[in-house]
Structure formats: C-alpha cells, structure tokens
Regions:
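Motif-centric detector for short Cys/His coordination patterns
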Residues: 1-105
Length: 105
C-alpha cells in the first residue's frame, strides 16, 4: 500500500497510505492552526480507494476508513516527501507519548 509520485524536478517519493492518512491536510486531522493537530490512531492498515484530481494543483485522496476531506496540494505532497523521515519519527514519538503502540505486521 504505497503511492509513488514523481515530480517535474526529477524527485520521486514513495508514501505509505498510513503516512498520507495521518498527515492529511484536512481540518479534522491538521486542525485549524499550529498545535491543534489530532493524533490519528489505528491507521496501520488504511488504503487509498480513489485519487481525484482537483484542478492542476491538488488531489483528493479517498481512504477506506471513509476519510476523504483532505486536499493534498502537489506542494504539500512534495514537502511530505522531503520531510518524510523526520515527520514519520515525529508521528511515532507522538504515538508513544500518547501511550499508543503502533501495530506492525
């Protein structure tokens, strides 16, 4: 369950569905400002069921847990790719701080 995106500058990133889901830019996940993020739990097995283009600047990802309100701009996706290692570690750290163990297969 990986989405691969190639950008015009030659950069190519692979994103797990879980990573994209827990970093959804929707207000229900990202909040309405810094510090208002909502920690997403139990998304280890989430999959993308549809990718809908939004103009020439974004895609709407539809996940099998019925989350579909995030518009992922290509700029945001690029940033998620560049910062993937640090952002993933931050997510794991926040899970641990919340006392949640991520399921591994």
């Amino acid at each position: 369950r990986v989405l691969e995106i190639s950008f015009d500058d030659g950069q190519r990133f692979e994103y797990t569905c879980e990573y994209l889901r827990v970093y959804s830019p929707s207000a229900e996940v990202a909040g309405h400002g810094p510090g208002q993020e909502v920690l997403q739990l139990g998304k280890e097995d989430v999959s993308i069921t549809a990718i809908d283009p939004v103009g020439n600047y974004a895609v709407r990802l539809v996940f099998d847990d019925n989350h579909d309100s995030g518009l992922y701009s290509f700029e945001y996706l690029y940033d998620l790719g560049v910062k993937q290692t640090a952002k993933w570690q931050d997510y794991l750290d926040r899970l641990a701080a919340a006392g949640h163990k991520r399921r591994t297969h």
